[in-house]
Swiss-Prot record:
<feature type="binding site">
    <location>
        <begin position="9"/>
        <end position="16"/>
    </location>
    <ligand>
        <name>ATP</name>
    </ligand>
</feature>
<dbReference type="GO" id="GO:0004797">
    <property type="term" value="F:thymidine kinase activity"/>
</dbReference>
<feature type="binding site">
    <location>
        <begin position="88"/>
        <end position="91"/>
    </location>
    <ligand>
        <name>ATP</name>
    </ligand>
</feature>
<dbReference type="GO" id="GO:0071897">
    <property type="term" value="P:DNA biosynthetic process"/>
</dbReference>
<keyword id="KW-0963">Cytoplasm</keyword>
<keyword id="KW-0418">Kinase</keyword>
<dbReference type="Pfam" id="PF00265">
    <property type="entry name" value="TK"/>
</dbReference>
<keyword id="KW-0067">ATP-binding</keyword>
<keyword id="KW-0237">DNA synthesis</keyword>
<dbReference type="GO" id="GO:0005829">
    <property type="term" value="C:cytosol"/>
</dbReference>
<comment type="similarity">
    <text>Belongs to the thymidine kinase family.</text>
</comment>
<dbReference type="InterPro" id="IPR001267">
    <property type="entry name" value="Thymidine_kinase"/>
</dbReference>
<dbReference type="GO" id="GO:0005524">
    <property type="term" value="F:ATP binding"/>
</dbReference>
<comment type="subunit">
    <text>Homotetramer.</text>
</comment>
<keyword id="KW-0808">Transferase</keyword>
<dbReference type="InterPro" id="IPR027417">
    <property type="entry name" value="P-loop_NTPase"/>
</dbReference>
<dbReference type="GO" id="GO:0046104">
    <property type="term" value="P:thymidine metabolic process"/>
</dbReference>
Length: 209
């Protein structure tokens, strides 16, 4: 039975790597997949989904007003049977788009695998994550580690001096080196201004296609 899955984590936990491996597993078995990526995420180039360890694949761009069920139906009409839809940076989905993806599962009987952050640098839910947590059939945390050794569940945005940034837009694409995954306890400390934190998780260079 097809299901809606949400794989969530803090920053730099390997979400995109996991997505690309899942897509590869489907293709290896002769099954066709569709990878969706938000237009505002163009770090690896428009329509390219790339992980920090160098894996990459072409994706179909969507915007905030893209009707995703219709997009999937057009893809099937043009290219034939589809066996899985995978969504990168799923936190940027709108409420309506999460519902549309649930329709892909329930009406078209196609599994949908969404990968994204749960919370932003203020510890608040993204819109897409909020409704995926509410409506997904299966939830799975992709774990990563805080510099303290505890499980990292939060993401902080730091300035050039390693101090927490508490204001600014929720969405800031690029500059991944400014984000650090930390435990809840460490998140509280740095947000209180107790010390500084180095952005240790530097993105690896992507290979040239």
């Amino acid at each position: 039975m097809a299901k809606l899955y949400f794989y969530y984590s803090a920053m730099n936990a390997g979400k995109t790597t996991t997505l690309l491996q899942s897509a590869h597993n489907y293709r290896e078995r002769g099954m066709r997949t569709l990878i969706l990526t938000p237009k505002l995420d163009h770090r690896a180039g428009s329509g390219v989904v790339a992980s920090r360890i160098g894996l990459r694949a072409d994706g179909r761009i969507f915007e905030r007003d893209t009707e995703l069920q219709q997009l999937v139906e057009r893809d099937i009409h043009n290219d034939g049977a589809l066996h899985c839809v995978l969504v990168d940076e799923a936190q940027f989905l709108s409420r309506a788009q999460v519902w549309q993806l649930s329709e892909v599962v329930d009406r078209l009987r196609i599994p949908v695998l969404c990968y994204g952050l749960r919370t932003d640098f203020r510890g608040e839910l993204f819109e897409g994550s909020q409704f995926l947590l509410a409506w997904a059939d299966e939830l799975e945390e992709i774990k990563t580690i805080c510099h303290s050794g505890s499980k990292a569940t939060m993401t902080v945005r730091v300035d050039a001096h390693g101090h927490a940034v508490q204001d600014g837009p929720q969405v800031e694409i690029g500059g991944n080196e400014r984000y650090v995954s930390v435990s809840r306890a460490e998140f509280k400390k740095i947000m209180r201004g107790e010390g500084r934190i180095d952005p240790l998780q530097i993105a690896l260079p992507l290979p040239v296609a």
